[in-house]
Amino acid sequence: SGYLPGKEYVYKYKGKVF
């Protein structure tokens, strides 16, 4: 969250929330 809009979903999917 707050790192890269759009990529946040990818990180969240992999279990990593940036």
Swiss-Prot record:
GO terms for cellular component: extracellular region; membrane; other organism cell membrane. Its main location: secreted. The keyword Ribosomal protein does not apply. Induction: Constitutively expressed. Keywords: Antibiotic, Antimicrobial, Fungicide, Membrane, Secreted, Target cell membrane, Target membrane. It is found in: Secreted; Target cell membrane. GO terms for biological process: antimicrobial humoral immune response mediated by antimicrobial peptide; defense response to fungus; defense response to Gram-negative bacterium; defense response to Gram-positive bacterium; killing of cells of another organism. The keyword GTP-binding does not apply. Has antifungal activity against yeasts like C.albicans MDM8 (MIC=15-30 uM), C.albicans IOC 4558 (MIC=7.5-15 uM), C.tropicalis IOC 4560 (MIC=3.8-7.5 uM) and C.guilliermondii IOC 4557 (MIC=3.8-7.5 uM) but not against filamentous fungi like A.niger, C.herbarum ATCC26362 or P.farinosus IBC251. Has weak activity against the Gram-positive bacterium M.luteus A270 (MIC=60-120 uM) and against Gram-negative bacteria P.aeruginosa ATCC27853 (MIC=60-120 uM) and S.marcescens ATCC4112 (MIC=60-120 uM). This is Longipin. It comes from Acutisoma longipes.
